[in-house]
């Protein structure tokens, strides 16, 4: 204590070593103060959800809306992935046709199917004309179209119909992927990916983690200092099974994961932003795939996308309420967090722009106000 007082009151009494130590101490304090300001100025959002719920697409949208987007050279870099997605999709349908015993409508289609199956989809970097012709022929085959209509019975990329409908453009020489092509490209997220951007002079860091079960053990160290949790769930997966486990309903798995995350101690007072994604795909499939077949408690009208959306939102809301309240309404603990829900289409830039503005104006503004950053 005496030496500390001497440092403040009698700096001329210090030895050279003590003066050097004092300078180091001051520098450390300056760095710590700067770090504290920086920590307050960068807000961390954790992006969670099951595989193929649209997390990576959401990150791409943040780059387009709040960042520099994708330059022509960067979009060119997605070309092999777009090609691979097309080969993976067509291969999945050809294999499913055999399992589902769906015949080709034209005898020539067998030759084109054999050609496509001879190519390893993950080694594709160019799109040769013979493969382009084979793909275009097959996509016009009534058997392939019938197989596509039964896509809930096998795993097929959501982007399949989009890419196959644009084959002529995509297989042209000198093809450069559009922003929409990039948004719809699919590569499973492994490990942890982060994207930083600024909104109204506030730095945001969105942390995206792998959605497959095998990746979830890597989440643990992302939970600290998160101001909000964004949970993406697919509205269209009510009639599908997990890619990792063909016996488990994907929506039930997503609901269970949502409940598990809500129970984690790190999130006791963290606001939860629920994005019920893929409204477009739900609207496409609901006329022929009835929600009540997979969720018998649904009493709403058939072929009604709005009724289906409300029912699915209610399931997630009840899961949230159940994690806040114990049996018969008894409180499990003091929870100051709130649930904010939005219907989204992650491939629709205008939709995501509006939804994220709503998030910014509610959750982020509330948090910034609390720490006096507004």
Swiss-Prot record:
<dbReference type="InterPro" id="IPR000654">
    <property type="entry name" value="Gprotein_alpha_Q"/>
</dbReference>
<feature type="binding site">
    <location>
        <begin position="208"/>
        <end position="212"/>
    </location>
    <ligand>
        <name>GTP</name>
    </ligand>
</feature>
<feature type="region of interest" description="G4 motif">
    <location>
        <begin position="273"/>
        <end position="280"/>
    </location>
</feature>
<dbReference type="GO" id="GO:0045202">
    <property type="term" value="C:synapse"/>
</dbReference>
<feature type="domain" description="G-alpha">
    <location>
        <begin position="41"/>
        <end position="374"/>
    </location>
</feature>
<feature type="region of interest" description="G5 motif">
    <location>
        <begin position="344"/>
        <end position="349"/>
    </location>
</feature>
<feature type="binding site">
    <location>
        <position position="189"/>
    </location>
    <ligand>
        <name>Mg(2+)</name>
    </ligand>
</feature>
<feature type="region of interest" description="G1 motif">
    <location>
        <begin position="44"/>
        <end position="57"/>
    </location>
</feature>
<feature type="binding site">
    <location>
        <begin position="49"/>
        <end position="56"/>
    </location>
    <ligand>
        <name>GTP</name>
    </ligand>
</feature>
<dbReference type="GO" id="GO:0007207">
    <property type="term" value="P:phospholipase C-activating G protein-coupled acetylcholine receptor signaling pathway"/>
</dbReference>
<dbReference type="GO" id="GO:0031683">
    <property type="term" value="F:G-protein beta/gamma-subunit complex binding"/>
</dbReference>
<dbReference type="InterPro" id="IPR011025">
    <property type="entry name" value="GproteinA_insert"/>
</dbReference>
<dbReference type="GO" id="GO:0001664">
    <property type="term" value="F:G protein-coupled receptor binding"/>
</dbReference>
<dbReference type="GO" id="GO:0005525">
    <property type="term" value="F:GTP binding"/>
</dbReference>
<keyword id="KW-0479">Metal-binding</keyword>
<keyword id="KW-0013">ADP-ribosylation</keyword>
<comment type="similarity">
    <text>Belongs to the G-alpha family. G(q) subfamily.</text>
</comment>
<feature type="binding site">
    <location>
        <begin position="277"/>
        <end position="280"/>
    </location>
    <ligand>
        <name>GTP</name>
    </ligand>
</feature>
<dbReference type="GO" id="GO:0003924">
    <property type="term" value="F:GTPase activity"/>
</dbReference>
<dbReference type="GO" id="GO:0005886">
    <property type="term" value="C:plasma membrane"/>
</dbReference>
<feature type="binding site">
    <location>
        <begin position="183"/>
        <end position="189"/>
    </location>
    <ligand>
        <name>GTP</name>
    </ligand>
</feature>
<dbReference type="GO" id="GO:0019722">
    <property type="term" value="P:calcium-mediated signaling"/>
</dbReference>
<dbReference type="InterPro" id="IPR027417">
    <property type="entry name" value="P-loop_NTPase"/>
</dbReference>
<comment type="subunit">
    <text>G proteins are composed of 3 units; alpha, beta and gamma. The alpha chain contains the guanine nucleotide binding site.</text>
</comment>
<feature type="region of interest" description="G3 motif">
    <location>
        <begin position="204"/>
        <end position="213"/>
    </location>
</feature>
<keyword id="KW-0807">Transducer</keyword>
<dbReference type="GO" id="GO:0005834">
    <property type="term" value="C:heterotrimeric G-protein complex"/>
</dbReference>
<feature type="modified residue" description="ADP-ribosylarginine; by cholera toxin">
    <location>
        <position position="186"/>
    </location>
</feature>
<comment type="function">
    <text>Guanine nucleotide-binding proteins (G proteins) are involved as modulators or transducers in various transmembrane signaling systems.</text>
</comment>
<keyword id="KW-0342">GTP-binding</keyword>
<keyword id="KW-0547">Nucleotide-binding</keyword>
<feature type="region of interest" description="G2 motif">
    <location>
        <begin position="181"/>
        <end position="189"/>
    </location>
</feature>
<protein>
    <recommendedName>
        <fullName>Guanine nucleotide-binding protein subunit alpha-15</fullName>
    </recommendedName>
</protein>
<dbReference type="GO" id="GO:0046872">
    <property type="term" value="F:metal ion binding"/>
</dbReference>
<feature type="binding site">
    <location>
        <position position="56"/>
    </location>
    <ligand>
        <name>Mg(2+)</name>
    </ligand>
</feature>
<dbReference type="InterPro" id="IPR001019">
    <property type="entry name" value="Gprotein_alpha_su"/>
</dbReference>
<dbReference type="Pfam" id="PF00503">
    <property type="entry name" value="G-alpha"/>
</dbReference>
<feature type="binding site">
    <location>
        <position position="346"/>
    </location>
    <ligand>
        <name>GTP</name>
    </ligand>
</feature>
<keyword id="KW-0460">Magnesium</keyword>
């Amino acid at each position: 204590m005496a030496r500390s007082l001497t440092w403040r009151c009698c700096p001329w009494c210090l030895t050279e070593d003590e003066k050097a130590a004092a300078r180091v101490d001051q520098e450390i304090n300056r760095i710590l103060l700067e770090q504290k300001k920086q920590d307050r100025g960068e807000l961390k959002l954790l992006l969670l959800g099951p595989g193929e719920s649209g997390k990576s697409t959401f990150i791409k949208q943040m780059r387009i809306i709040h960042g520099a987007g994708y330059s022509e050279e960067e979009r060119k870099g997605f070309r092999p992935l777009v090609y691979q997605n097309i080969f993976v999709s067509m291969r999945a349908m050809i294999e499913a046709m055999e399992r589902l015993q769906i015949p080709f409508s034209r005898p020539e289609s067998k030759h084109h199917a054999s050609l496509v199956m001879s190519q390893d989809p993950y080694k594709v970097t160019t799109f040769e004309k013979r493969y382009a012709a084979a793909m275009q022929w097959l996509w016009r085959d009534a058997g392939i179209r019938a197989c596509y209509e039964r896509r809930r019975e096998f795993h097929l990329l959501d982007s399949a119909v989009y890419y196959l409908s644009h084959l002529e453009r995509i297989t042209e020489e000198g093809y450069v992927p559009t922003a929409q092509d990039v948004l719809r490209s699919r590569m499973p997220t492994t490990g942890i990916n982060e994207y930083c951007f600024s909104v109204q002079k506030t730095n945001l860091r969105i942390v995206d983690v792998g959605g497959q079960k095998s990746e979830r053990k890597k989440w643990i160290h992302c939970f600290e200092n998160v101001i909000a949790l964004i949970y993406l769930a697919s509205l269209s997966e009510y009639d599908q099974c997990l890619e990792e486990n063909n016996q488990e309903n994907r929506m039930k798995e997503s609901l269970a994961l949502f409940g598990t995350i809500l129970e984690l101690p790190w999130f006791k007072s963290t606001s939860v932003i629920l994005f019920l994604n893929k409204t477009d795909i739900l609207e496409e499939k609901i006329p022929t795939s009835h929600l009540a077949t997979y969720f018998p408690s649904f009493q709403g009208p058939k072929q009604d996308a709005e009724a289906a959306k409300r029912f699915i939102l209610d399931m997630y809301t009840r899961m949230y309420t159940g994690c806040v309240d114990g049996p018969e309404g008894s409180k499990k603990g003091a929870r100051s967090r709130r649930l904010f829900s939005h219907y989204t289409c992650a491939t629709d830039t205008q939709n995501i722009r509006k939804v994220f503005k709503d998030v910014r104006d509610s959750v982020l503004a509330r948090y910034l106000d609390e720490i006096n950053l507004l």
